[in-house]
Amino acid sequence: MPEKPGKADSPERWKRRTFLKTCGAVLAGPSLPGAALAEWWAGELPAQSQTSADKSRGRPVLERANPIVGTGWRGHMFPGAAAPFGLVQLSPDSSGPPDAKWNIQGDWYEWQHCSGYNYRDNVISGFSHTHIQGAGGIDLGDVLVMPVVEGKNWSWDPGKIEVLNEMQIAALGTDAGIVFSPSELGYRSFFSHEHESARPGYYSVHLQTPDVQAEMTATTRCGMHRYQYPAATAGVRQGLVVDLAHGLNCRVYAAELTVESSGRISGQRSTHGWAQDRHVYFVMELSHPAAAVEVSVDGAIATAQPGSEFSGKEIKLIFTRTPASGPLLVRVGISPVSLEGAAKNLQAEIPAWDFDEVVHQTGRSWTDALSTIDASFSQSSTEETFYSNVYHGLVAPAAYNDTDGAFRGQDGQNHPNPGFTKYTTLSIWDIYRGEFPFLTLLQPRRVNDIVRTLVLDYQQLDQHALPMWPLWGNETWSMIGFHAAGMILGAYVRGFRDFDIEAAYAAIRDTALVGAEARGNRALQAMFRQYGYVPSDLREGGVSSTLDLSYDYWSAGAMAELLGKKDDSAMFYKLGQNYKNVFNPATGFMQGRSKNGKWRDPFRPDQEFDDYVESDAWQASFSVPHDVQGLISLYGGDAAFVDKLEGLFTAPSRVIDARPDVTGMVGQDAQGNEPSNHHPYLFSFAGAAWKTQYWSREVAALYNNTAAGIPGNDDCGQLSSWFVLTALGFYPVNAATGVYVLGSPLVDRASILNPLTGSKFTIIAENNSAENVFIQRAELNGKELHRSWLSHQQLTTAGELHFRMGRTPNKDWATAPADRPPSGFIPA
């Protein structure tokens, strides 16, 4: 029986959680590794995945990355065109396959379309200009464009989608029949993956219903389309729909449109969604003037003349093409600031009607970004998996300034150029773990600006708190903790100092001692300080909040220590030990307890009680990255810890009351959820580096180069960066320290370019293969390496790491305490 709403639950949230839990066992699908998972997810294998060994050898790096990877299963990726860290992501919004299990009423269906697209779909609604990469939240989808042909899909509306509820699914079985019929399509179109292709900065698809070939590319702030219509037929109109009412789970509360001419429009829309108050401005131009322009405002249709202005909540427009005018090009400038900003962005980034040149220039940007790593593999499919994940790791965060530097702040006001690139779409709870360290290695020029963004957001929010999940000038306050503190610390430790460190520390301190009132965070942190943990009878997610806050307070303490603030350091370090207060020695797990100290009873470690966030007790009990040695002590020493940790990977994968986002299971380890990402690397802290090598390979096998190739929500690059770093042979357990724990490299050879100095760090894995997963011997710069970790400074300096791999483990390597990764230690 579903539980009753808790104190922290609204009725709506309780209803949503109850529904997802009820459906979880059916919807989550089996917990399957790698190929078996893809096999179950029928239809998930794009043509690009059918590679043979050697096929990609010698291909330009741009052709090795496949944006379609991760667009199915639970990856929540979009396949469309974007520039590195671009604000515009021009991509199809899709819907509806003929599959009963797929079309679930309400949040489940929407959640599977967080990026606007899912590979299982067979219908495209149109192409919108803004998307979120791999997140578990849904928003954006601004300024949708769709070609239409009379008698095929000419319509003002997107048609109807039949969404089945769970009772209908039970009645129909596994085959629901056709979700759409042609009369219900509206302006949507059927499509086939056989006629769809993507590479970084470019996307194309054949729209079957109107018989239109659609292509698109993007720059940082602009999008460009090219549409090839069928040969004109007398009396049959061809046109282009522009839908300002379309959105991804966001509601338009105000919109404006100006028809400046028959080939140029401009406007804005304001939405309520995950981002509570978002404003988007655009300028759109056509390569050929339209023969007619019609506008629908809240259902009333009128012919528009140059200079016509419209306002309302639901504004749509149809351009009627001039017959026999050739391919239609469309260019769109986007701005979060103003119409003037959108026009300036368009003029600066796409000044001419040369689609191929924009594709070329954006491709060059991607080539430069992807070429920071030069990696080779024995299998070309692994190479494509690798570079696809590098690509995904370079999509977010998004640059949030106009070309003149102006931006919309967290205070809801427009601001002039702050002197740096302002960023948005920062999934901090996710990316602090691996994505941000990944960026410090591959994109160091962006690191100081990301930190400046965090501090500026703190100042403009005026909430006594650093941001948690900023999205388009809105703080969503999503997830838990204040992990921006660890990001600032991690940047500082790695030598990034071109920001106001005193202002940054003031932001960390204020967040730690006061915190945001939003979502009850201030009260939650007060509970943490008062009780020494977050009581589960007072707040949902008490165990996970306790663990995350322990890390955050440790981060504040480490930052204070580095700045010579001894009293603060002692205070925060003490709070960083609060994780011990939710460890129940009787069960051997991190466990919920009430304000009176009573442990949750009954208790099962494989059940998703409300004490945990994106985890159960198995997965949460190892979330102490700042004090792994302390965690080992709680378990009774090295041997007991290794046994417990191995139990995580070998336990049955069933999770009771699992939400649909519990994915990527290896035993009870859930790679699809971020709290599990560091688990394979913990063995090395107890002197069992060979087990880190084994289990990191097992988890990496969940990834592949298909649409189902990412084992969960990518969350703005976190799961992708995990694979990239793991394939290179290392991963940061405590992301703030600049320490990377060595694992088992997938690369045969790789070099990492430091863009700041031009130096290269080379990794060689001799005798590497799918069977030879164990390090026999390691050398750093020609000298034998006995320890199982490297520092950020070593990885960003010219050097060579040479592994000799083998089939049997070298159980003596890196076993001495001095050779194990430091826990909570920040190297000079």
Regions flagged by a language model, labelled:
Residues 1-18, 25-29, 41-43:
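N-terminal secretory signal peptides
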Residues 12-13, 34-63:
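C-terminal segment of N-terminal export signals and the immediately downstream linker at the start
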Residues 51-486, 490-547, 560-581, 587-590, ...:
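Accessory carbohydrate-recognition regions in carbohydrate-active enzymes
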Residues 774:
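Extracellular attachment/recognition segments
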